[in-house]
């Protein structure tokens, strides 16, 4: 499966738009990370525990996005974007979305 943030794929024509596909995950914060994050915010700097958590969550969202497109018979996903939002206190959602397409042969 080809997936990209661009609207086109070099050397390939989009022959059919399958539709919008999404992949999301809601990730809760770990109480230990929350305590360390609070301390880190006092002195400044990167909160690595949260950075790792969001990176892992983004990977899950991408995997779900690709699975959704494959289930619909797509060859690729173009125009991928990400959103992040707070769902409730202590948890965040990461959503990946894009357009599932079918591709013609290589030019």
UniProtKB/Swiss-Prot annotation:
InterPro entries attached to this UniProt entry: UPF0145_dom_sf, UPF0145_YbjQ-like
Family listed: Belongs to the UPF0145 family.
Protein name, entry field: UPF0145 protein Sfri_2095
Native organism: Shewanella frigidimarina (strain NCIMB 400)
